[in-house]
Regions:
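Short, acidic, small-residue-rich periplasmic hinge/interaction motif at the N-terminus
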Residues: 33-35, 44-46, 76-80, 90-139, ...
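Short acidic/polar hinge/loop motifs at secondary-structure boundaries
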Residues: 63, 186-215
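A beta-strand signature from Gram-negative outer-membrane beta-barrel systems
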Residues: 201-246
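Short strand-turn segments of transmembrane beta-barrel domains in outer membranes
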Residues: 216, 234-275, 306
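Repeated loop/turn-to-beta-strand initiation elements of outer-membrane beta-barrel proteins
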Residues: 282-285, 326-329, 376-380, 434-438, ...
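Flexible loop and strand-edge segments within Gram-negative outer membrane beta-barrel domains
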Residues: 293-380, 386-420
Length: 489
């Protein structure tokens, strides 16, 4: 396998541009503006049919080097219309191109996707079938959780587990280990085949959701056979040279059928607050807290029992980052405290003796990521994540006549399941030439589990190497071969 991979790499390297392009280079600079005169950030400026180019920063300025000669300059991005014009690059003078005006394309901006792509691009140019739920759609739907956000999406089916109080989902008719949940491109750990992590994310912190249908096993592993759902969170607005701040709050109340009690108890109750600071030196801070109170739904049941279990969630998060022209580094911590309540009635013989089977979950998710664009040809993404998931089953008995409460001593009535995981990923995107790009990557995952049904504290670790290439001989055709090899212990 390793020999075959090396052969593929050597074949790809054989298409490197001619050494003639390594002549003496001169400096090229300028700035890009929008039609209203504002700086246009993150616009790609390149010389057509070459590997020379750069990207505008937060002030719209760009700078790169290229050999002297006559070229066609291309100014484009997924958020703006493409613009081309002839230029002459000469030695001994300043090659400055001021106030290059581009026209923004709002419709195209809404279709930008990143999941499974070599670089951000419009949805119509993706080789995969990708759907995106953007920030405007999220605001219009006013969801209380991720399930209510995705339950109207085509190809997604939700199912409620009455016994555990959890919601599972299917993508393209496949569920469990065939669908991968990502947060900012990092896999989320789950207790089993049920993807409960999807219901344990704060919907108020989501910028957009990208749904990729079809196999993504080369990049994300064999458990992405049906596809992936990538939850992309809100971050700083980017480097702008100015200090800004924001504060937001949200209160939402809903009935559950005909059942409702104001602010607490029956019905659905959501309160959220978030704040952010962006300093002119590139530092940014974000934080927020959300409370989800689901009073459950009794339906046709009587007494204490509920057809849908009540659930109370507290979600907190914080982020600190630094962003400049070609670098974005950030750390994020998410915390979940979830309680799913299972009240039961007493028996006909002892109606005053009732039991409660509750599920108590705590989840910590740490993420450290860095995006570094070295030049117009090479960019690198580094990611490190530590996740700690703990779920406790607690069964108690209560004597309603005396108020006495005690833990149940029955088998399997008390249980603790815990998973810990380290995940590290490194990917690079290398534009070898105008028609071919290469994306190698390395992923390491270490997982430890323990619980009542697990013998001891076993660990699983695997190291994977993957490489993918994209060859685009014509504008209407793209070919993307890929291979993934892994070692598991």
């Amino acid at each position: 396998m390793i020999k075959n991979i090396c052969t593929v790499i050597l074949l790809l390297l054989s298409v490197l541009p001619a050494a003639g392009q390594n002549r003496v280079k001169v400096k090229i600079s300028g700035n890009v503006i929008t039609t209203d005169g504002a700086p246009a950030e993150y616009i790609t400026v390149s010389l057509k049919n070459t590997v020379f180019g750069g990207m505008s920063d937060g002030d719209g300025n760009f700078e790169f080097a290229a050999p002297p000669g006559e070229y066609t300059m291309v100014v484009q991005s997924v958020t703006a219309h493409r613009k081309e014009f002839p230029v002459t690059i000469e030695t001994g003078r300043e090659n400055v191109f001021p106030n290059i005006e581009v026209k923004e394309d709002i419709n195209q901006l809404e279709e930008v996707v990143v999941t499974g792509q070599f670089s951000p691009q419009s949805m119509k140019n993706s080789l995969y079938k990708v759907r995106s739920v953007n920030s405007d759609q999220i605001r219009q739907k006013a969801p209380l959780d991720v399930q209510s956000l995705l339950n109207t999406e085509i190809g997604i089916r939700l199912s409620n587990d009455m016994a555990l109080g959890e919601t599972d989902f299917e993508l393209m008719g496949m569920s469990g280990n065939n669908v991968k949940i990502l947060m900012d491109g990092i896999p989320m750990i789950d207790r089993g085949s049920t993807k409960q992590s999807l219901s344990q994310l704060d919907v108020n912190r989501i910028e957009r959701v990208e749904i990729v249908e079809g196999p993504m096993s080369v990049v994300y592993g064999t458990d992405a056979l049906a596809g992936v759902i990538n939850i992309i969170t809100k971050k700083g607005p980017g480097y702008s040279g100015e200090s800004t701040w924001r504060v937001g709050a949200r209160i939402q109340e809903e009935t559950m059928g005909k059942e409702y009690q104001f602010f607490n108890g029956e019905g659905l109750h959501n309160e959220s607050i978030d704040l952010g600071f962006n300093l002119k030196n590139g530092l940014y801070f974000n934080g927020g807290y959300t409370r989800n109170d689901n009073g459950g739904w009794q339906g046709d049941l009587t007494g204490r029992e509920k057809r849908w279990h009540p659930k109370d969630q507290s979600l907190a998060n914080g982020m600190i980052g630094f962003q400049r022209r070609n670098l974005n580094v950030w750390y994020r911590l998410d915390f979940l405290d979830e309680k799913i309540f299972g009240p039961l009635n007493g028996t006909a013989i002892e109606p005053e003796k009732v039991s409660d089977k509750d599920y108590l979950t705590k989840r910590y998710t740490h993420q450290l990521q860095a995006d570094w664009r070295l030049d117009n040809r090479l960019s690198v993404n580094l990611a490190l994540s530590y996740q700690d998931y703990k779920r406790r089953t607690q069964t108690t008995w209560t004597d309603l006549s005396t108020g006495e409460k005690w833990l149940s001593a029955e088998d399997a009535s008390q249980d603790v399941t815990q998973y810990k995981a380290w995940i590290a990923r490194a990917t690079a995107t290398w534009n070898i030439g105008p028609k071919i790009s290469l994306q190698p990557g390395l992923e390491y995952q270490w997982t430890e589990g323990k619980g009542g049904r697990i013998d001891g504290t076993p660990t699983i670790s695997d190291l994977a190497f993957f490489i993918s290439a994209e060859y685009k001989p014509w504008s209407w055709m793209s070919v993307r071969p890929g291979v993934r090899a892994f070692l598991m212990a």
